[in-house]
């Protein structure tokens, strides 16, 4: 974002523009930026004409223009397009050497760059940014669900197949029509990314779900990664910040950054599952009585220690999918339609935001949460084959995998896990994932190249593991594209192998399991 020329006009020049009754030409309306910019302008009553080199049938996000009155030229940038417009907005990805700029300059059409759009049209509603390592998508989707249930309309990017935390999406989404902007932010550990979003969206509140190792190489430092998430903390000084105080990394970060503002904490009162350790800000290792990976009760001699949160979930029953939330204004029973302790955390953070940010009553919140069926790809049941349940889950980092597998063990007992992950933490992360799989699953099918490589190493050291690790007939080829760790064929082979194991539940984990989940339909037939 910092390497892109975002603005072409000074603040003084922008303030002097007379945009009344002007027609805006947007290049690249089939792309993310062009699509969102066009809709922002139309939401504010402007006339927009679009153009894109894609054919109409290939325009990926065409359906998001349903309900809008927009003229679009597909397959070219015709002369008449330039004749009709008063201002033109090119996508930031368009090279300045592109021929279209010669036409623009020849016709002397004023250019507005993306940065000019950001300056001209600030968010006109309250904004909340949600970040953390795990739980962002579920928390964002659930808070939107609660808002809709209460009669509020959150802004929606409506870009089919796109997560809302990529590149410019959150910053542009906050400028679309709606009563409130509920934004998933901070998809990776890149410094400056969150800060840019906060600068452009001007949020008044935020949720920090947890901080665990993700998107890290073997040489990376969890605390450096935490500082990236700390950009949200910095940006919300003097404003509202909702945090999971069961996470010592978060509470230490707040202390390190000397946060002052409306800090609201949440956490669980639950029996710990095991002892865990994370690096403390003082340089020591901090021991955690873990409820789920990386969070629980803790006490470091440097002064970072567990304290009872403002909102706490008690009387948790995973069987009945309910818990009691105790907060500043009393105790209330919450019934969930989703499963697992990690989702109790997600629900609790959303409850706090619904109360403190949206100002909703517990009656509305209770009803809304009880009707939320979850996010596709999060412990999602895809169907049944020979009376066996097949599920997929996006878990792709060691902490997320451990949490999901632990909860599956509690809920379903014996199960088989098909691993399609190639950890962004490298070989170390792949080893952690297989160790967790051995701890919680009855059978493990390493379907990705990375998981198969680690499985072969484990079996070489301990041949008895072949009782639990079930290899596919085809050896996975070396493949990785960011967090995508397996091909469609490898996912198919993994699920086929999993169906031959003696359990009633099979779960495929990782981005590839989600991307290629349609292969499960082949087995249903």
Question: Where on the chain are the PLM-derived regions?
Answer:
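Short beta-strand "acidic-cap" motif of Rossmann-like dinucleotide-binding folds
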Residues: 47-52, 155-156, 265
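Phosphate-binding loop of NTP-binding sites
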Residues: 13-23, 33, 37-44, 62-63, ...
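Glycine-rich, highly charged phosphate/nucleotide-binding loops
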Residues: 66-80
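Short amphipathic alpha-helix with an adjacent loop that forms part of the alpha/beta core around
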Residues: 77-84, 199, 492-500
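ATP-dependent carboxylate-amine ligase
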Residues: 1-57, 70, 88, 109, ...
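Acidic, Mg2+-coordinating active-site environments of NTP-dependent enzymes
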Residues: 80-85, 90, 96-110, 152, ...
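Short, ordered loop/turn segments at secondary-structure junctions
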Residues: 53-54, 77, 116-117, 159-160, ...
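Short loop/edge segments at beta-strand edges and connector loops
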Residues: 74-76, 113-115, 158, 243-245, ...
């Amino acid at each position: 974002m910092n390497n892109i020329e975002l603005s072409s006009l000074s603040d003084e020049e922008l303030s002097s523009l007379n945009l009344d009754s002007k027609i805006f030409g947007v290049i690249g309306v089939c792309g993310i930026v062009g699509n969102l910019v066009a809709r922002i302008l139309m939401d504010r009553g402007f006339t927009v004409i679009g153009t894109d080199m894609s054919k109409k049938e290939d325009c990926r996000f065409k359906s998001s223009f349903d309900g809008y009155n927009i003229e679009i030229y597909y397959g070219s940038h015709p002369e008449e397009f330039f004749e009709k417009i008063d201002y033109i907005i090119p996508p930031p990805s368009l090279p300045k050497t592109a021929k279209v700029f010669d036409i623009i300059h020849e016709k002397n059409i004023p250019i507005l760059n993306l940065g000019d759009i950001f300056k001209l049209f600030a968010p006109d509603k309250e904004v909340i940014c949600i970040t953390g390592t795990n739980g962002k998508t579920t928390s964002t989707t659930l808070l939107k669900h609660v808002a809709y249930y209460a009669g509020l309309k959150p802004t929606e990017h409506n870009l089919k197949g796109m997560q809302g935390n990529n590149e410019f999406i959150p910053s542009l989404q906050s400028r679309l029509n709606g009563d409130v902007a509920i934004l998933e932010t901070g998809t990776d550990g890149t410094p400056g990314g969150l800060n840019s979003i906060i600068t452009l969206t001007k949020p008044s509140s935020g949720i920090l779900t947890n901080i665990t190792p993700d998107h890290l190489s073997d040489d990376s430092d969890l605390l450096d990664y935490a500082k990236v998430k700390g950009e949200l903390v910095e940006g919300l000084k003097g404003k509202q910040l909702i945090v999971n105080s069961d996470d010592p990394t978060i509470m230490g970060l707040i202390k390190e950054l000397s946060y002052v503002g409306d800090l609201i904490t949440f956490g669980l009162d639950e029996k710990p599952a095991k002892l865990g350790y994370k690096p403390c800000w003082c340089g020591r290792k901090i021991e955690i009585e873990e409820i789920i990976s990386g969070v629980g009760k803790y006490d470091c001699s440097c002064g970072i220690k567990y304290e009872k949160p403002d909102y706490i979930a008690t009387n948790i029953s995973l069987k009945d999918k309910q818990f009691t939330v105790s907060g500043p204004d009393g105790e209330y029973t919450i019934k969930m339609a989703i499963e697992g302790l990690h989702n109790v955390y997600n629900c609790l953070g959303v409850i706090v935001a619904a109360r403190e940010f949206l100002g909703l009553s517990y009656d509305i919140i209770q009803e809304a949460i009880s009707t939320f069926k979850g996010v596709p790809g999060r412990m999602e049941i895809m169907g049944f084959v020979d009376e066996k349940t097949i599920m997929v889950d996006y878990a792709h980092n060691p902490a997320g995998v451990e949490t999901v597998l632990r909860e599956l063990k509690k809920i379903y007992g014996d199960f088989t896990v098909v691993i399609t992950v190639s950890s962004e933490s490298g070989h170390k992360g792949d080893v952690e994932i297989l160790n967790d799989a051995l701890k919680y699953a009855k059978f493990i099918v390493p379907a990705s190249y990375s998981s198969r490589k680690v499985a072969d190493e484990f079996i070489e050291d301990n041949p008895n593991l072949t009782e639990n690790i079930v290899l596919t007939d085809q050896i996975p080829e070396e493949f990785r594209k960011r967090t995508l760790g397996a091909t469609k064929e490898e996912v198919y082979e993994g699920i086929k192998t999993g169906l031959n194991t003696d359990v009633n539940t099979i779960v495929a984990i990782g981005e590839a399991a989600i991307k290629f989940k349609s292969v499960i339909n082949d087995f249903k037939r």
